[in-house]
């Protein structure tokens, strides 16, 4: 099924990308796909390799090994010019006016003069920058500079979006605006790859998530797929049970006790009914439920304690 | 989109960014104003300062005609006036209204001056005194007519044969040469520094990362160099043209054709010199990430320019046709400043001009490759200053 999809739907494919800085492997065989029309959340700790991967995609950094393809073809300069990029370290010409800056960048990406002006005005309006359109970028607040930077990534109607921490530094209203913009772009068939530390936002917004740790992809898939891979966790509330009643139950591990509720991770093939029976043996059971781990928990599981 | 369009877009941004800034307009206006001031100063103050005002009093008043003639042969322009009262004359010297007061009989003149007597004026006065003394001595010999002897002596002189026709415009040519040398030096320094600052600005503001996700490093560098170069060329042309027109109108210059030719040569050499220095300035700028570090990294490059300028002033004034001047003026780092100066003096053989241009162009090609490589290797690396060797490795 996946193979068929890969054939039918264009995708941004990151394939076996490696990049070393001295002794540090910033990327070690990083592979994943962002399909057209998909919002892909790229998650990982500081220095895990997100930014390096994105810079490799944009050709700002040359990979030591591996390849990045879009629609089946390895990326070249002409293809990358149709990408939209928000770098981790923001940067615009400080003394250039907002409108001029966006028009200039749109033209550099291949737009004609009129088209560039229309697109720049359009994004200025959409991102709420109208009153600042003639201001120099250096005179804007950081939040507004961030909006201009986003407009710079979007102004040339890119085929592919690669955004490094697009939500950081935005106020809640701007977060909503940007989320809507990203959904709309994905709806138009654009693959959107973005990194974020706001995992609740990623969980809410993204179709798929990739987790990277120390340069290696440790998990990749929809949040439900990640959940499925993390095993079954049950929560048991047995008020009459003595503390430690669940210790040593075959095939289970206690992962936490909270307000008298015991959380148990079940090994593959362990019958949850056996756990329920053991709980009932201690007295009444008020609650017995399967727990749906949040992305935050899945992330902690995936990267372990060592991150 | 073609590479040419990308380069043009980048160049156009530089043009707009510079031409619109107030500092550029003010800078050009100030340069023109300074030039006007210099020309006016030349035509009025310096012109007046060449006249020596001499007051004659008592018996010395008979010298009013002969002093002027005698002084002129020694290159001094004397305006003699009669002063009735020597005391009043001395007061005029003290006040600076007179440069010298001459009193006493012609055979024993006394001179009062402020501090020192101009050497040429002293010789002129000495000659007059000696003539007077000689005339008295000759008058004592009976069979001689003193006037005839003096006339015979006056007619005697060396016979001079010039190998070249005398160049009456020598001083003007030198002035034009020095002005073009100074203008070229300032333009190259200013616009070379601007290239470096522009590179550092893009690096320190990190805008270079989104630019390089779109265009290649060489396109970005070439666009910047072309854009700033055109601004510099326009500024030099405007200042130069205003200078020539003004100097001709005020009759400070009587060789407008030669001056215009010098300006055109100056623009040509500005282009060559700018291309030569711009790649070096850009490469140096790309090694640092903060504006504060720019001056330090540019110091070796600006030192070469300063050296070329100082050498240019000295050599062009003293020996525009000497071997050292000829050699230095064909070497690429110095040629863009020295050669137009020699051309202005009409001291540059066509072969040497062609050689200098060819060498500079070859150096431009070499430095563009080298500078482009350093730039591409260093432009995306932030943090501390990057060692040259690492930048070359890329």
Put a short name on every predicted segment.
Chain A
Residues 12, 19-213, 219:
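ABC transporter nucleotide-binding domains
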Residues 90, 250-253, 283:
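Structural motif
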Residues 79, 227-230, 299-302:
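Short, flexible helix/strand-to-coil boundary loops that buttress conserved ligand/catalytic motifs
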Residues 15, 64, 138, 253-255, ...:
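A short, local hydrophobic-aromatic micro-motif
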Residues 267-307:
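C-terminal coupling/interaction segments
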Residues 1-17:
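Conserved N-terminal strand/loop that marks the beginning of ABC ATPase nucleotide-binding domains
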Residues 179-267:
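ABC transporter nucleotide-binding domain
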């Amino acid at each position: 099924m996946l193979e068929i999809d890969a054939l039918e739907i264009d995708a941004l494919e990151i394939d076996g990308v490696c990049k070393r800085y001295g002794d540090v492997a910033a990327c070690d065989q990083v592979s994943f796909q962002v399909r057209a029309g998909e919002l892909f959340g790229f998650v990982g700790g500081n220095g895990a390799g997100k930014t390096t991967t994105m810079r490799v995609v944009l050709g700002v950094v040359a990979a030591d090994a591996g390849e990045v393809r879009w629609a089946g073809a390895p990326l070249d300069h002409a293809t990358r010019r149709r990408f939209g990029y928000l770098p981790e370290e923001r940067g615009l010409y400080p003394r250039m006016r907002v409108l001029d800056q966006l028009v200039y960048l749109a033209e550099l990406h291949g737009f004609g003069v009129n088209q560039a002006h229309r697109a720049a005005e359009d994004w200025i309006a959409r991102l709420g920058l109208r009153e600042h359109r003639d201001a120099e970028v250096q005179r804007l607040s950081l939040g507004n500079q961030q909006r201009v930077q986003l407009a710079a990534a979007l102004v040339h109607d890119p085929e592919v979006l690669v955004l490094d921490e697009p939500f950081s530094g935005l106020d809640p209203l701007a977060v909503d605006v940007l989320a809507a913009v990203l959904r709309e772009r994905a709806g138009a068939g654009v693959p959107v790859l973005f990194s974020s530390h706001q995992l609740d936002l990623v969980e809410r917004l993204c179709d798929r998530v990739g987790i990277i740790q120390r340069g290696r992809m440790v998990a990749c898939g929809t949040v439900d797929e990640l959940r499925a891979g993390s095993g079954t966790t049950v929560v048991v509330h047995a008020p009459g049970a003595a503390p430690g009643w669940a210790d040593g139950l075959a095939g289970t591990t206690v992962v936490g006790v909270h307000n008298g509720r015991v959380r148990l991770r079940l090994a593959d093939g362990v019958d949850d009914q056996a756990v329920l029976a053991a709980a009932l043996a201690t007295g009444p059971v008020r609650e017995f439920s399967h727990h749906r781990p949040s992305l935050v928990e899945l992330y902690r599981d995936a990267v372990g304690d060592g991150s | 989109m073609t590479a040419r369009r990308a380069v043009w877009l980048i160049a156009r941004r530089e043009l707009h960014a510079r031409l619109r800034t107030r500092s550029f307009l003010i800078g050009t206006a100030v340069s023109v104003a300074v030039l006007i001031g210099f020309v006016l100063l030349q035509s009025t103050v310096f012109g007046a300062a060449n006249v020596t005002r001499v007051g004659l009093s008592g018996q010395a008043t008979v010298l009013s005609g002969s002093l002027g003639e005698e002084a002129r042969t020694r290159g001094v322009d004397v305006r003699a006036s009669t002063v009735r009262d020597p005391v009043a004359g001395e007061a005029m010297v003290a006040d600076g209204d007179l440069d010298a007061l001459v009193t006493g009989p012609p055979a024993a003149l006394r001179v009062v001056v402020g501090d020192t007597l101009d050497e040429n004026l002293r010789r002129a006065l000495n000659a007059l005194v000696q003539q007077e003394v000689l005339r008295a001595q000759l008058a004592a010999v009976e069979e001689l007519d003193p006037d005839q002897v003096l006339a015979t002596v006056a007619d005697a002189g060396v016979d001079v044969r010039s190998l070249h026709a005398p160049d009456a415009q020598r001083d003007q040519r030198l002035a034009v040469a020095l002005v073009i040398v100074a203008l070229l030096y300032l333009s190259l320094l200013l616009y070379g520094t601007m290239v470096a600052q522009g590179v550092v600005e893009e690096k320190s503001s990190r805008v270079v990362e989104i630019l390089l996700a779109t265009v290649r490093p060489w396109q970005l560098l070439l666009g910047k160099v072309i854009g700033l170069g055109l601004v510099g060329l326009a500024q030099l042309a405007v200042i130069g043209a205003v200078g020539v027109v003004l100097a001709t109108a005020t009759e400070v210059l009587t060789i407008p054709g030669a001056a215009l030719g010098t300006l055109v040569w100056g623009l040509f050499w500005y282009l060559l010199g700018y291309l030569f220095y711009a790649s070096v300035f850009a490469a140096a700028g790309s090694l640092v990430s903060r504006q504060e570090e720019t001056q330090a990294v540019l110091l070796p490059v600006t030192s070469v320019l300063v050296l070329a300028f100082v050498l240019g002033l000295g050599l062009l004034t003293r020996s525009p046709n000497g071997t050292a001047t000829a050699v230095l003026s064909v070497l690429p780092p110095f040629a863009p400043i020295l050669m137009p100066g020699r051309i202005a003096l009409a001291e540059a053989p066509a072969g040497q001009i062609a050689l200098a241009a060819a060498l500079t162009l070859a150096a431009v090609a070499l430095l563009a490759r080298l500078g482009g490589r350093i730039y591409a290797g260093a432009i995306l690396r932030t943090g501390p200053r990057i060692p040259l060797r690492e930048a070359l490795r890329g």
